[in-house]
A protein has these predicted regions:
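Hydrophobic alpha-helical transmembrane segments and their immediately adjacent juxtamembrane loops
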Residues: 134-193
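Peripheral, non-transmembrane regulatory/ligand-interaction domains of membrane transport proteins
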Residues: 1-122, 128-131, 135-142
């Protein structure tokens, strides 16, 4: 699929913050390069919340790209239905499934982090925490909507293909019957009785 998700670990230690991932995490680059205004790594909880924010934001950006790609494939499918476009839609649907799974897991992790007694949430973090919750919830809802729309679109195109096949079968049946009539007539007159 064009998009995929990877696990990410963030370790808060007294000496600093460590992030571990199986692949490139380009969404973290603004945090690591210091391009996020007002970010302090002194409070590890703030950094963790910013990571969640960046994750949700990256998913929303990816969702916009997926929606644009789906729209392009939809326009192609309106002209002619080929396997290439249908497979492209399937790839996008897989990506949306990965997004939804990852976002829901992130929401669950965020809820669990709030209950960890050893993490000391500063008052400043509470507003950011609420913002991150809203951003994650919005991303989850938008991905779910996009997934439903894509599923409905694929069902509609499947119905179109089925209708087209039915029309072709009707024509072929009619042609077969028409071609069978001369054979039937010749068979009747050609019998030796």
């Amino acid at each position: 699929p064009p998009w995929r998700t990877l696990p990410l670990s963030v370790l808060l230690t007294p000496q600093g913050i460590v992030t571990l991932s199986q692949g490139t995490t380009s969404f973290l680059q603004p945090l690591l390069d210091g391009h996020v205004q007002g970010l302090s790594t002194v409070r590890g909880t703030e950094f963790v919340l910013r990571v969640f924010w960046q994750l949700a934001d990256a998913c929303l950006r990816g969702l916009r790209e997926i929606n644009a790609g789906v729209e392009g494939l939809e326009n192609e499918l309106k002209r002619s239905i080929r396997n290439k476009e249908v497979l492209g839609l399937l790839d996008f649907q897989k990506s949306l499934t990965f997004f939804a799974t990852g976002l829901k897991a992130n929401e669950l992790v965020l809820e669990r982090l709030q209950r960890v007694p050893t993490l000391h949430w500063a008052d400043q973090d509470q507003e950011l925490l609420d913002d991150v919750r809203v951003e994650l919830r919005q991303a989850i809802e938008m991905v779910d909507i996009a997934d439903r729309v894509l599923s409905d679109m694929m069902d509609a195109f499947a119905s179109i293909v089925s209708n087209n096949l039915n029309s072709v079968m009707k024509v072929l049946t009619s042609v077969t019957i028409i071609l069978a009539v001369p054979t039937l007539i010749a068979s009747v007159y050609g019998m030796n009785v």
